[in-house]
Amino acid sequence: MVVPPSVAPVGNVGNFELGGQAAGLPSGTMQYAGMTWVKKQYKWNPGDPPEAVAGLINEAHASGMKILLSIPGQLAPSSIDFEAYTTFLGGVAALGPDAIEVWNEMNIDREWPAGQIDPTSYVNNMLRPAYQKIKAANPNVMVITGAPAPTGYFGGCGGGGCDDAPYVAGMMAAGAGSASDCIGVHYNEGIMPPSATSGDPRGAGGHYTRYFQGMINAYTGAGAGALCFTELGYLSGEEWGTLPAGFLWRAPYNLTVAEQAQYLAEAVRVGVQSGRVRLIIVFNVDFKTFGDDPQAGYAMIRPNGSCPACETLRQVMGQ
């Protein structure tokens, strides 16, 4: 039995809110942990009717949760139909979700056509038209930019791929601030406490993407206003005794379950106290798959059904 560490409440959270990405909808567990949001991802295909996501919205609201819909799409096969996609988002907004994230990790060629990666194109062709159509349909929907993939791999920014901080700087220069309510952020490779900015044992240990505080600092430095962490995860393989090679950043299994619980709560504290973070969505609440992509290792609800992070998050949120 993992006994989670005791965590002091952060105090006044202001307009900060907490949620989780869930495979199901364990709303009672989530609400116990201080969460008011659930994130669901829907992969858009040209021709999809907006009603395809109505069930997700209705289920969340019936459970007393707000819902963030992350809506990436097909590359089909080498271009994106911006008009069809943004029209779809306008139709979704009319159904009453609480937030929409416009695409996903558009700085890498897994999520954007190779050779066409460009923050200015994203803002002009996708984000701004989407923002206008969403707000026309329902001005209460929060519009979050797609979160870039955190990376220093490209050493800059080009059509084949773009590091996330220069991508965000490019988005802001193109006017993303007036075409969104929040800048999306992903952070899921951490093995250091959330307040740390140095000491990571991996190569490139000084790179900002290794650190939660580093991400806040880098995106703020790139000109971003309010930040919404639409994926925040800490990976523990403790119950399995190991992790796949691509996810093993500190032997034998990155973090203990107790560390995961502590770091998630500390990330909330650091985020709230920064004054920069509007929303944190924990990745994830209840995923059960553990393979080449060890999603269950990120889960708050562990294989034995316990949820140490539920206790630490509840405490830090002052529940």
PLM features: what roles do these ranges have?
Residues 3-45:
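Boundary/entry segment of secreted carbohydrate-active catalytic domains
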Residues 9, 21, 30, 106, ...:
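Aromatic-rich peripheral "rim/lid" segments of glycoside hydrolase catalytic domains that contact
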Residues 20-32, 52-53, 80-92, 160-174, ...:
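Short, acidic/polar
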Residues 28-31, 35-98, 110, 114-146, ...:
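Aromatic-lined substrate-binding rim segments of carbohydrate-active enzymes
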Residues 50, 54-58, 184-247, 268-277, ...:
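Glycoside hydrolase catalytic-domain groove-lining segments
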Residues 60-64, 94-96, 129-141, 174-179, ...:
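A structural motif corresponding to the C-terminal end of an alpha-helix
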Residues 88-120, 142-152, 178-194, 229-232, ...:
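Active-site groove signature of glycoside hydrolases
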Residues 127-168, 211-212, 216-237, 276-287:
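Aromatic-lined carbohydrate-recognition surfaces of secreted/lumenal glycan-active proteins
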